[in-house]
Regions:
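Central regulatory/effector-binding core of bacterial HTH transcription factors
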Residues: 1-47
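Residues at or immediately flanking beta-strands
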Residues: 13-18, 116-118, 167-169
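Hydrophobic hinge/microswitch elements
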Residues: 22-27, 31-35, 40, 103-155
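Alpha-helical segments flanking ligand/cofactor-binding loops in enzyme cores
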Residues: 27-28, 52, 81, 128-129, ...
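Short beta-strand->loop
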Residues: 50-60, 116, 150-164
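Flexible hinge/capping segments at coil-to-helix
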Residues: 51-89, 93
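Secondary-structure junction motif
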Residues: 70-71, 78, 87-109, 178-180, ...
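A late-sequence structural motif
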Residues: 155-197
């Protein structure tokens, strides 16, 4: 949102179209010239694509904010084996978040294939609402769940032994002449996140 607000302030006559999808589809759309720029949580293809890391984010396990999970947060202290007994809602296959979650769970000693995955959902807002309503727990980025955590709608548990986070990348086709709007958008991302060339 910060980037979109700044872009709109600087270029009020420009209109941008936003499509929410997983990292695999973002890269496909970039390669096939269906989109000029995109954002991914994982680096997938480097032959055609240029990735600019602009933000460090970490994944967290989110749960409903109930007495059971508040107690678990106090007692578990870094042990997430309880996750194996939960209904889990994941991002869809192809999602950078899902790929990164699998990697971090393995590092924490959890085999992702042992999870009781009851749903795979594309939209993060739908996942967060489903968790709030008690359908299950999920693994999403801390940034994506910040407002819900702050408001007390969900609880966030860190994943132990995770690294220092994952890069969120701006991606574009390096073999394709970008539109003026796309170049201006990339410039705004660089300004907002203070990225050197």
């Amino acid at each position: 949102p910060k980037v979109l607000i700044r872009f709109n302030e600087k270029y009020p006559n420009e209109q941008i179209k936003i499509i929410e999808t997983d990292s695999t589809k973002v890269v496909t759309q970039i390669i096939e010239h269906m989109a000029d720029v995109g954002f991914t949580g994982t680096v997938l293809e480097k032959k055609h694509c240029k990735y600019i890391p602009f933000y460090k984010d970490e994944l967290v396990i989110i749960t409903p904010n109930t007495e059971r999970y508040r107690k678990l947060r106090e007692e578990a202290a870094g042990d997430i084996r309880w996750l194996l007994k939960e209904h889990v809602i994941m991002r869809e296959e192809g999602s950078g978040t899902r790929k990164e979650a699998r990697k971090q769970l393995k590092r924490a000693g959890i085999n992702p294939s042992d999870l009781d995955i009851i749903a795979s959902i594309e939209n993060q807002e739908t996942i967060k609402k489903s968790v709030r309503q008690g359908m299950g727990v999920s693994i999403l980025s801390r940034l994506a769940t910040k407002d819900e955590t702050r408001a007390g709608h969900v609880l966030a548990f860190p994943i132990p032994k995770s690294d220092d986070g994952r890069d969120i990348n701006l991606v574009y086709n390096k073999n394709y002449q970008l539109s003026g709007s796309a170049e201006r958008f990339i410039k705004v991302v660089r300004e907002v996140y203070q990225i050197k060339r």
